Amino acid sequence: MNSEILNIPDIHVGNMIIDYLKSHDRTQSYLARVLEMNVANLNKILKKKSMETERLFEISMKLDYNFFAVFGNDLNLTDAGTYKITMPELGLHIERRMRDLRMTQMEFEEKTGIRRSDVNRILKKVSFDTDKLRVISDALNYNFFKDFYSAKDDPMAEQQNEQSNMGMILRLEELAGENRLQKQEIENLKKENLYLKTKLTEAGIEF
């Protein structure tokens, strides 16, 4: 039902890129060269239906073509000069959407097939497989592919970027706090261990 609302196209990403190269009289050898990889490795990547968003972002940048806009049904924002493209903190965006929907990790698992034990790891990721991101988008009724781009000189997009940056800052502060707590726990355990060793030594017990 959600996929009908969003209407995110089910795309073979490799074929989409190959078709683009052909229509613009460019070869796979050219793409391999600008990506600084050998042609054999590129061929393997392009044979696959899906691709990591980080890789698709790189290819979009190198070819000056917004492939994410195809997933977003914004074909008017595919060509150079019509859009701004950014690499969002996808995990943060997904987590924020879950909070907005008040969706539990159990519900997220039911809708996406991602195990609850993996959810926290997923929410810290920056790059996602395009097929997986499509599933997550459908489950949360939000097209996350649109977070990669905006219309050029769109003031609303600038505001969203600022909010995203603030979210990243808050996440970093949260992780720093967790790190400090973990370090303190380790120090406490070391002190406790030293205390126990001292007591055992005083009692004449070898260890």
Regions found by a protein language model. Give the residues of each.
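Short alpha-helical DNA-recognition segment
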Residues: 24-41, 100-120
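Heptad-repeat coiled-coil/leucine-zipper oligomerization helices
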Residues: 104, 161-185, 190-192, 197-199, ...
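A short, Lys/Arg-rich alpha-helix, primarily the initiator
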Residues: 1-24, 76-101
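N-terminal, leucine/charged-rich tether regions that mediate assembly and partner docking
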Residues: 1-45, 55, 65-71
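Short C-terminal boundary/hinge segments that cap the last helix of small helical domains
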Residues: 64-81, 141-158
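Short, basic-rich loop-to-helix N-cap that marks the start of a DNA-contacting helix
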Residues: 48-61, 125-138
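Helical coiled-coil/dimerization "stalks"
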Residues: 12, 53, 57, 79-80, ...
